[in-house]
Amino acid sequence: MAEKLTDCSRLCIHTMTTKPWTLQEAVAGYIAAEATGITVWRQHIEPYGAKKAGQILRDSGLEVVSLCRGGFFPATGAQAREKARNENRRIIDEAREIGAPLVVLVCGAVPGQPRAVSRQQILDGIDAVVPHAKEAGVKLAIEPLHPMYADDRSAVNTLEQANNLIFALGSEQVGVTVDVYHLWWDPFLESEIK
């Protein structure tokens, strides 16, 4: 049987897990739970704007661990891919404004498009925004999603695929986010983490 959690000093709570709460309610609730960190989903900062949301977060004393989510790079047309890149640059700016050192990337996929094509578009998209992320002092983290999301959410479904993208990018600005919900099944999970 698992031990009861008694030390929350390293606990970070994601605002999506308390979705009905506003950012202010989440901040108050997390502090009451003695959590020290917060990961913010973009929809929770939208009602305030990044500047005001950043002030709320700074005033709270919580450590902003990351901003979710960027990504969604694949598209069937070049104009749509460039629009996604520009949106990711705005997301990086939001992360900087709220004090998040990291943007989690849900990389995207296009239904009916071969996943290899989508992965190449993901690679190209991340590569295009890395200079902006570096300038902003914000890191990017590829989050592989469970294969059930491969059709329209992410063509990156294993940690190996994410690590291969990172290797190809060759940038210290890019890493991975390992979510047990999405990767528990991966037979190479432990070796890919190492």
Regions found by a protein language model. Give the residues of each.
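Acidic/histidine-rich catalytic cores of soluble enzymes
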Residues: 24, 31, 38, 67, ...
